[in-house]
Regions:
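Short active-site loop at a secondary-structure junction
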Residues: 69-72, 102-165, 212-224, 294-297, ...
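N-terminal secretory signal peptides
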Residues: 1-11, 23-30
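Short, well-ordered beta-strand elements
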Residues: 364, 372-391
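Short, gly/Ser/Thr-rich active-site loops of penicillin-recognizing serine hydrolases
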Residues: 339-340, 353-359, 391-435
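C-terminal region of N-terminal signal peptides and the immediate post-cleavage residues
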Residues: 29-46
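Short, surface-exposed loop or secondary-structure junction motifs
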Residues: 86-100, 153-369, 373-374
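Twin-arginine (Tat) signal peptide motif
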Residues: 8-15, 35
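Short, conserved catalytic-motif segment at the N-terminal edge
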Residues: 52-113, 135-137, 152
């Protein structure tokens, strides 16, 4: 990866996060006239599970806009209540465009996309599951699980807790200061620098003078470094004694296998991966965050799998993991002292109601050098929207999802109110057992 690839991913992600209220305070309208319609209606690829005409048309409008803006391939997953049984869910999926432009491979239900930072919700799930078993505590010091390796402290001796890691309040920088340590020239970034980043490099990076940007708990700063550390700590707790951090194995054993999410794996194990592309149409390098900070962004997934993830997090079904995933939507911290309206669950950012969309919702997005994704959850109505793309950027994909949310999700809660009462799937945004 070159500096441009790393910088573009970071910038687009940070822009969306730094204006967290934008999507909730104004209806975002996509440019669906002239350019989007120039090629005529775009039908979803074979294998799509299409919803009612109104939904299908709304998705088609968004898909055409993105495809005509240079995104090669897309997958959508929408979860909503079953009209005949509001305690059950219905999933629709839509696949468009190409997973591999040069070889003419279309996006199908099997197509895997890099989900980058949406991986953080799976990392948080490892923590939530260990908490549910009484094996760790949310306010435990992270150093309790670092096998004797010291972690940085604030100038007043403040130590990092698991709560702070899972809510971006640890003070750790976005990327490790020594992220390029595995490159031939450690002073310059390189392709696969994340894959080459070992556990020993992680411990050394944590001792770097630039590792901690502020005292733990005092501010909010999005941190791949922090979630990478959390992923390694929790994976080592679950599967101890491994030479390499067992993040992928821990996620498979504890999370994805029990949910039947067979297409959600660490990137090196992907068999149907969509090729990521730059905005100019050239191939982008694989994100390949498969080393010691994989918990920050190392997984790939499919639209079908992400619908399972969203539905279970909303509280649908009877999988034993349901209470673990729904607990992650409980507010356990504010995003930042200067912006208390925007709360943090475990990895999920919690958005307040606004006049334009009078329901709270949770969001998590992800972007790599050439892939983008986002999932929005509206628990009090039992809806979710996921978009996966092998091109574009967060400034394109995130508003597209918000646009669909405004178009499709009822303005008023279906299950109770949007001020803290639980949804039909027993989920709310009130502070719960972790608060």
């Amino acid at each position: 990866m070159d500096n441009q690839d790393r910088g573009s991913a970071r910038t687009s992600r940070r822009q969306f996060i730094s204006v967290a209220g934008l999507a909730a305070t104004a209806v975002i309208t996509l440019a669906t006239s002239s350019t989007a319609g120039a090629a005529g209606p775009t039908a979803p690829n074979p294998g799509s599970r299409v919803g009612d005409p109104a939904e299908a048309q709304a998705v088609q409008r968004v898909a055409e806009t993105l495809l005509n803006s240079g995104v090669p391939g897309l997958a959508f997953a929408i979860v909503k209540p079953d009209e005949k049984n509001r305690k059950a869910s219905v999933t629709t999926t839509y696949h468009y465009g190409q997973a591999d432009v040069e070889n003419g491979v279309r996006v199908t239900p099997r197509t895997q996309f890099e989900i980058a930072s949406e991986t953080k919700t799976f990392t948080a799930a490892l923590l939530a599951k260990l908490i549910s078993r009484g094996e760790v505590g949310l306010d435990d010091l992270a150093s309790k699980y670092s096998d004797g390796n010291p972690l940085p402290k604030g100038i007043g001796g403040e130590e990092i807790t698991l709560r702070q890691l899972v809510t971006h309040r640890s003070g750790l920088s976005d990327d490790p200061p020594n992220l390029s340590a595995g490159c031939a020239d450690p002073t310059r970034s390189c392709t696969d620098e994340k894959a080459k980043y070992t556990r020993n490099m992680l411990w050394k990076g944590l001792q770097d003078a630039g590792a901690l940007e502020f005292a733990p708990g005092s501010h909010w700063l999005y941190s791949d470094f922090g979630f990478g550390l959390l992923g390694t700590l929790m994976a080592d707790k679950i599967i101890p004694g491994q030479e390499k951090p067992p993040f992928a194995a821990a996620v498979a054993r504890e999370i994805t296998d029990p949910l039947g999410m067979m297409g959600t794996v660490i990137e090196t194990k992907a068999t149907d991966l969509a090729v990521p592309y730059h905005l100019d149409g050239t191939r982008a390098p694989l994100w390949n965050n498969t080393g010691a900070i994989a918990g920050g962004g190392g997984l790939v997934s499919t639209a079908e799998d992400m619908s399972i993830w969203a539905a279970t997090t909303l509280g649908y079904g009877n999988n034993p993991l349901k209470p673990v995933l729904t607990s992650m939507l409980e507010q356990i911290d504010t995003q930042a002292p200067e912006n208390p309206a925007f709360g943090m669950g475990m990895a999920w950012q919690l958005q307040p109601p606004t006049p334009n969309f009078p329901q709270r919702f949770a969001k998590k997005n992800g972007d790599s050098s050439g892939s983008n994704c986002i999932t929005l959850l509206v628990p009090d109505s039992g809806w979710s929207i996921t978009i996966l793309a092998n091109g574009g950027n967060a400034a394109m994909i995130d508003p597209a999802a918000v646009n669909l949310m405004h178009d499709l999700v009822p303005r008023q809660p279906i299950f109770g109110s949007s001020t803290g009462s639980s949804s039909g799937s027993d989920v709310g945004f009130q502070t719960g057992s972790f608060g």
